[in-house]
């Protein structure tokens, strides 16, 4: 019985000591890798999904109210509030009492103002009252001439269709009404605005604002603002000729700038595309280089299986790890084995199971030691 037990143990140990190409250790290493993969790659997505479903069902069960669901389709009646009628707004503005300098009604002349106080505006059709010294004259009504202003005060603007009153010494002339000539300005004062582009009186005066872009009369005058957005001409130009089209130049510059920006964007996109293409090409080259087997390894394996190599794929050159396999090309199917070279073969990299490595060596050494101990002491 003792000898039988020794024989069984020895046979088991001898079977375990077989080389790896016999298949025993390969299957053992596969089992180890399989166990490691199963232990490490635990997929917790199913557990997470179960927890989400459980939480959703629990929340639905706690938050549901069947009465609310039944009554959800029924419209809720809102309590209508009674709208109180709004009180009409009253004009709470205080009307100024009639007194000295108060405005008069239509057709009545305005009262003369005191010294230092502005004259009241006259009604339509009535002449404005003369203003006191140092006070601006009141504007005249439509169709009536404006009153003359006092010394040092600007003249009032005339009504439509009436000539403007002359301004006092040192004060600017008032603007004339539509269709009427502007009043002469005081000494050293700019001329008023003129309708229809009337020329200003006197030399060395700044041209007023003119409609239609008419030039100002007289030399050494700066061109005023003209309708149509035309730029003013420089000094010492007769007739206020418009300058070269600055807007056109600006538009061209803007167009060039926009085109440059668009070109820059296209160039940037092109560079990005080229970079992406180069990256893709580099990855493809790396993959091809990884799939190309070593020429030395191919030649050595060809010398081993030269006599048995055909048009079918040969076994992998290794039992574990990365190796190479090969076959004849169709054009070299009838060649003799001695005439075959690397150009007549199709090769590719083959990957087998990972080798057991140090674990396999240690286990085989322990089994050998146990077998020797049993054999020597029995």
Swiss-Prot record:
The superkingdom of the source organism is Eukaryota
What is the protein name given in its UniProt record?
A: Circumsporozoite protein
The cellular component terms of Gene Ontology attached to this UniProt record, alphabetical and capped at eight, are: cell surface; cytoplasm; plasma membrane; side of membrane
- Gene name linked to the record: CSP
Question: Know anything about its domains from the record?
Answer: The N-terminus is involved in the initial binding to heparan sulfate proteoglycans (HSPGs) on the surface of host hepatocytes. The N-terminus masks the TSP type-1 (TSR) domain which maintains the sporozoites in a migratory state, enabling them to complete their journey to the salivary gland in the mosquito vector and then to the host liver. The unmasking of the TSP type-1 (TSR) domain when the sporozoite interacts with the host hepatocyte also protects sporozoites from host antibodies.
Task: Output compositional bias ranges, type Low complexity.
Answer: 96-203, 228-251
Location of region: Required for the binding to heparan sulfate proteoglycans (HSPGs) on the surface of host hepatocytes: 81-89
Membrane topology note: Lipid-anchor; GPI-anchor
